[in-house]
Each structure stands twice: as structure tokens, then as C-alpha cells.
A protein has these predicted regions:
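Phosphate-binding glycine-rich loop
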Residues: 6-13, 17-59, 73-77, 83-85
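PLP-dependent aminotransferase class I/II
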Residues: 17-24, 32-35, 96, 108-112, ...
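Structural detector of well-ordered beta-strand residues that form the stable sheet scaffold
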Residues: 36, 61, 82, 134-136, ...
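PLP-dependent aminotransferase-like
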Residues: 50-130, 134-139
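Conserved active-site segment immediately N-terminal to the catalytic lysine
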Residues: 137-166, 195, 202-207
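Active-site PLP attachment segment
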Residues: 150-192, 217
Length: 349
């Protein structure tokens, strides 16, 4: 198997030659100077925020409608998540909502590129920069989607169901050489020397805080093979999303969450009335629908930072994720759309 041959060249499962090659290939694909591979997007968000100086006494502006993995790094760093509402049509934050949420304690903005949709904060980027507020993009669902050009640390996920998979893993796109160096050090427990260098010496230096966050060569090998075929996967995902959108375009009561024309979609999410009932009917029929995600500001772990977010709370009762993966066909999407409409039309009781 090609992944196995790639991984074997490194001679070990930990980070090494193959991970470094994967980083260079990612940088070339994304057309950026450097990419720092990490063990997960959650680790990537943690390290990116840490690099920006997020810690006790600081706040991070973040949407509530996201996976808990976006929020936990903020809390782990001792900072405060300042939850904000999103646009009901995209489930992404907008510049004006970010601007209104800024306080003297704000150190970073963490937009979530929901479903693969880019979040454009260009209109406030200059204001944020002048206030020393950093942008860290949670692009866990957005590999392959266009980048907006705003100076941001961008974090990708290479989990098993993502557009690009390494089975597990992620990557951070740094803005500067200094950030790249800081990220590489902090992903290695704050140790300044590489593992290869350490086995040749009797000591090493721990320069600062860090996590065990390196991407293994085994996972990097999988990622390299998947990157080589990514354009094919991207086409399949766009075709599948468009098939859903076409099938549901004129359906009464259904709103398809828009990911934008150029995105590589991660999923297809709709808003429907009576979501819980529809969800149950479709699950009973064997259709793998889901909900992504319950709002974080209503979770017990984050209750101390809850705020009134009426849009988030309304859409949270309506969103439904339809089955979505590149092994599906457009026929599958049309069948699922028809099943959704049948479930919605079924009388209650």
C-alpha cells in the first residue's frame, strides 16, 4: 500500500521526514510559505491562540454554533470565550457582530468556517490589527476552500471525515517565520531541539509552554496520498452539495445553509421546522442525519460565559445535517432529499 511505503521511509511512527515532506506539499498546494503539521486541529487552535498571547485575562470572540473542540482550547489557556451570534443563512459570523463584541480584553477572534465557507473579515481587519487583536481561523471544515487574504493563523483538520484526511491530524498556517518557529517548538512540549537531535545528545532545553502535538509520519503518509488525489475529492464534494441544493431549491420550509460557490463543502446542512421530529423519522428509516452542533453557550461546561444569542438559539432548533461523503452519488443525494421532504410532510403523531 502506498501509504505504508511512504511511512516506512521514516523508520519510525513519530514525526520525521514524511511529516516534513507533507508540510512542504501542503504549503505548495495552499500557496503559502510554510505549514506546521500538528496532531489535531484542536491542538492547532490551542497552539495558534497561545502564539497570539491568549491566556488569563484575555477574551476570544467566537461563535457558539461550533464543535466543542473550538472552545476547549480557549478555556484550557485560561481565557474567556466571548460568544457571538452568526448569520442564519450561513451559520458563520459576520464582521459587524465581531466588531460589536470587542472589549479591552479581546486578544483574538476565532471565526469558524462552517461547512467550508470562508469568513471574510476584511472590512475590520485593519481595526483589529491596530488593537492588537489577532485572527485565528478555525478552518477544520474548510480545506480546499478559498482563503480571503486577511492576515490570519489558519487551522485545518485532517480527521477521518474531513475533505483531506490523514486519519488524524491537522495543520496551522503561520503568518511569519517567527510564528512558524514558535508553533514547532510548542507542538514539541516547548523543547527547542528536534527528536532526531535529542537522541544524539545528553540534554535538551524546554524553552516555553507546549503540548505533545506532532503529527506522526504514519498519518503524514496517509495525508500525502490523499493530497495527491484531493482535486478529485473536491469535485465529488461540490457535485454532491449541488445535487442536494438543486433537489431542495424550491422545497417549502427547507433552507439549505449556503457554503458559497467556491468552497469545498464539508457537509450539507439544512434548516427545517420540527427538526427533532424529522430527525427521528429519518433515523428510523435508516438515513444517517445528525445535528452539528448544539450551541456551546448553553453547555454546562461553558455556562459561566453564556449570553443571549437569539439567532443561534433559534437555528439550533432547526439545523439538520444530511448524509455527506464522497462515496455518495448525486442519485443518493436526490433520494435523501426526497426522504427529507417525505418526513416533513408526515403528519405529527
Amino acid at each position: 500500500m502506498l501509504e505504508e511505503r511512504h511511512g516506512a521511509t521514516a523508520g519510525r511512527a513519530s514525526a520525521g521526514l514524511v511529516a516534513a515532506l507533507f508540510e512542504r506539499e501542503l504549503a505548495s498546494y495552499l500557496r503559502v510559505p510554510d505549514v506546521v503539521a500538528v496532531s489535531s486541529a484542536t491542538v492547532g487552535i490551542h497552539l495558534a491562540l497561545q502564539t497570539c498571547g491568549v491566556g488569563p485575562g484575555t477574551e476570544v470572540i467566537v461563535p457558539s454554533q461550533t464543535f466543542a473542540a473550538t472552545i476547549q482550547p480557549i478555556v484550557a489557556l485560561g481565557a474567556v470565550p466571548r460568544f457571538i451570534d452568526h448569520s442564519p443563512g450561513t451559520l458563520c459570523v459576520e464582521a459587524e457582530a465581531v466588531k460589536e463584541a470587542i472589549t479591552p480584553a479581546t486578544r483574538a477572534v476565532l471565526p469558524v468556517l462552517y461547512g467550508g465557507r470562508p469568513v471574510d473579515l476584511t472590512s475590520i481587519a485593519s481595526d483589529l490589527r491596530h488593537q492588537n487583536i489577532h485572527i485565528v481561523e478555525d478552518a477544520a471544515q474548510a480545506f480546499g476552500s478559498p482563503r480571503t487574504g486577511v492576515q490570519a493563523l489558519t487551522v485545518y483538520s485532517f480527521g477521518p471525515i474531513k475533505q483531506l484526511t490523514a486519519l488524524v491530524g491537522g495543520a496551522v498556517v503561520p503568518r511569519t517565520v517567527e510564528e512558524a518557529e514558535a508553533l514547532r517548538q510548542s507542538r514539541s512540549l516547548g523543547i527547542t531541539s528536534s527528536q532526531t537531535d535529542r537522541i544524539r545528545t545528553t540534554t535538551y532545553c524546554v524553552q516555553g509552554p507546549g503540548l505533545r502535538g506532532v503529527l506522526s509520519d504514519v498519518n503524514a503518509a496517509v495525508g500525502r496520498v490523499q493530497l495527491a488525489r484531493f482535486e478529485t475529492v473536491a469535485v465529488l464534494r461540490r457535485e454532491l452539495w449541488n445535487a442536494y441544493a438543486q433537489a431542495l431549491r424550491d422545497a417549502p420550509g427547507v433552507a439549505v445553509i449556503d457554503v458559497g460557490n467556491d468552497a469545498v463543502p464539508f457537509n450539507c446542512v439544512v434548516r427545517v421546522p420540527g427538526r427533532n421530529r424529522v430527525h427521528g423519522i429519518m433515523r428510523d428509516r435508516g438515513v444517517g442525519v445528525g445535528v452539528h452542533y448544539p450551541p456551546n453557550h448553553l453547555q454546562p461546561a461553558f455556562a459561566r460565559w453564556t449570553r443571549s444569542l437569539p439567532i443561534t438559539e433559534r437555528t439550533a432548533e432547526e439545523i439538520l445535517s444530511l448524509p455527506f461523503h464522497p462515496a455518495m452519488t448525486c442519485h443518493d443525494a436526490r433520494w435523501t432529499a426526497a426522504a427529507l421532504l417525505e418526513a416533513m410532510a408526515r403528519p405529527p403523531g
